[in-house]
From Swiss-Prot:
Main location: plastid
Residues carrying the site annotation May be essential for binding and transport of phosphoenolpyruvate: 222
Family the entry assigns: Belongs to the TPT transporter family. TPT (TC 2.A.7.9) subfamily.
Keywords, sorted A to Z: Chloroplast, Membrane, Plastid, Transit peptide, Transmembrane, Transmembrane helix, Transport
Membrane topology: Multi-pass membrane protein
Topological domains, Chloroplast intermembrane: 82-101, 156-212, 298-375
Assembly: Homodimer.
Organism: Flaveria trinervia (Clustered yellowtops)
Coiled coil: none
One GO MF term: phosphoglycerate transmembrane transporter activity
Protein name, entry field: Triose phosphate/phosphate translocator, chloroplastic
Targeting presequence: 1-81
Amino acid sequence: MESRVLSSGATAISGVPRLTKPAGRITTTTVAVAFPARLNATGGNVVWGRQLRPSLLNLDHSSPVSLVTKPVKRDVLKPCSATASDSAGDAAPVGFLAKYPFLVTGFFFFMWYFLNVIFNILNKKIYNYFPYPYFVSVIHLAVGVVYCLGSWTVGLPKRAPVDSNILKLLIPVGFCHALGHVTSNVSFAAVAVSFTHTIKALEPFFNAAASQFVLGQSIPISLWLSLAPVVIGVSMASLTELSFNWLGFISAMISNISFTYRSIYSKKAMTDMDSTNLYAYISIIALLFCIPPAVLFEGPQLLKHGFNDAIAKVGMIKFISDLFWVGMFYHLYNQIATNTLERVAPLTHAVGNVLKRVFVIGFSIIVFGNKISTQTAIGTSIAIAGVAIYSLIKARIEEEKRRMKSA
């Protein structure tokens, strides 16, 4: 609503009183109401980029808005001095991390790789003197659940409420997560870490197959062709792997299938819950599924000689500390991976995920001194290259779909 000033020389309109200039100087000022970032005066979200008309805002809630108000004498507000980051003077100074976001993203990638490598190395060291993957899988999830419960207690983050409908959607996700996690650890305990990760490079193949034949989605021929090097590379590595055994191979394959169905059920269980709370609830559900088989398959052996043998080899303090830290590293690297995905584009995350697998395979070979044949090394390299090509093509297809939807 624009205000209009009637000059004293204008002709008066019949029926409308003539406005006279009041005594004293009237200064018209524009009052800028500064709200905190993202919040307005009532706590709602502010939609930036739109100017709210002053006449439509009733800042004084004790009285209704009057269409005709008496002129009020106000002092002229002196403009605030502009900050270094905003010439208008209405924004707070930009912090160092906000000014250089790539440093924060780089830190997330570093922590993701570091925690993942440490987890895989410590996990394999535990299996060298305590070969009970079902029990260790329970410890992984239990430490993470305790961590989540502690975080909820202090409100970092605030616990998201759940109802029976959400739980019905999350239970299949938690079951697939539990099955994939346990079978991965069975494979880690049975064969070399590098070989397990080479087999797990086939996971994109199972994802594509499930999308095509289970969900009925059309997979481009370019994606199928990019998976050929993955299958060939894993086959080459498996034929000459020195630590090969069928338990480790089949367990890793079941893990691939389980995580594929976890992805399918996750898409069906999409909620407005943030990733931290969502992963916490999935961990709790997965823990409940992991406890019965651990008690059934390994309980008697653990009580008979499992715990005593481990304590005799490394001592009780180291045994307990190893179990605690391997569980903590497992939870943190999964949480950091989720946070990293939220910060970068799918293409960047896909490349980072491939490089992470390369780091894990390389460091595990160096730390444990695993001897690999030339054919295994070539096959592993071909498989990793195929995963990289597949991830790049898939990420670009997803980006094109988002651009078409936004256009």
